[in-house]
From Swiss-Prot:
It comes from Methanosarcina mazei (strain ATCC BAA-159 / DSM 3647 / Goe1 / Go1 / JCM 11833 / OCM 88). It comes from the Archaea. Disulfide bonds: none annotated. GO terms for molecular function: deacetylase activity. PANTHER family: GANGLIOSIDE INDUCED DIFFERENTIATION ASSOCIATED PROTEIN 2-RELATED, MACRO DOMAIN-CONTAINING PROTEIN. Residues 8-187 form the Macro domain. Signal peptide: none annotated. InterPro entries: Macro_dom, Macro_dom-like. This is Macro domain-containing protein MM_0177.
Length: 187
């Protein structure tokens, strides 16, 4: 395994590699993978954070395709072309807004990962990169979200050969710490 991270994106540092789950700190928009996951809002028409960055980088054709999808319910996922991104596809999923943990947020977040991975499998996507869904403006606690992400990815990969590799992309050191902690609990 000779410096695999340079194939994904120049300048992203590999943090951890456990079987088919890899953790990276860096910009998901620049990743050279088959698909990136967009932490979208229900309209799929762009917004702030990762969603806005993906829409800006992919170009105006992404917005035009998203308009034809008629939005996306929370916990579901839809797929589009990657347009100007290095990734061939964008899988858009709508995470839950944190409301204290008593409104089904955990299951909705788990569903985001499952539905995205199911689309990846169905489209024969070998490499996929996830941001930390719902942990930004939607306020989902980072460690709790990381535990859900890791458990859903692990469970799916145990039953499916595709995707071959799942990247969990952290936007900062604290985000990486949360994912590493969650991974250490399942080892």
């Amino acid at each position: 395994m000779k410096n695999q991270n340079t194939r994904v994106e120049e300048g992203i540092r590999m943090e951890l590699n456990i079987d088919r789950i890899r953790i990276f700190e860096g910009d998901i928009v620049k990743m050279r993978v088959d698909a990136i996951v967009n932490a979208a809002n229900n309209t799929l028409l762009g917004g702030g954070g990762v969603d806005g960055a993906i829409h800006r980088a992919a170009g105006p054709a992404l917005l035009e395709e998203c308009k034809t999808l008629n939005g996306c319910p929370t916990g579901e996922a839809k797929i589009t072309s990657g347009y100007l991104l290095p990734a061939k596809y964008i899988i858009h999923t709508v995470g839950p807004v944190w409301q204290g943990g008593e409104k089904g947020e955990d299951e909705l977040l788990a569903s985001c990962y499952r539905k995205s991975l199911e689309l990846a499998r169905d489209y024969k996507i070998k490499t996929i990169a996830f941001p930390a869904i719902s942990t930004g403006a939607y306020g989902f606690p980072s460690e709790r979200a990381a535990g859900i992400a890791v458990s859903q990815v692990k469970e799916f990969l145990q039953k499916n050969e595709i995707p071959e590799t799942v990247y969990l992309v952290c936007y900062n050191k604290d985000s990486c710490k949360s994912i590493k902690k969650a991974l250490s609990k399942i080892l």
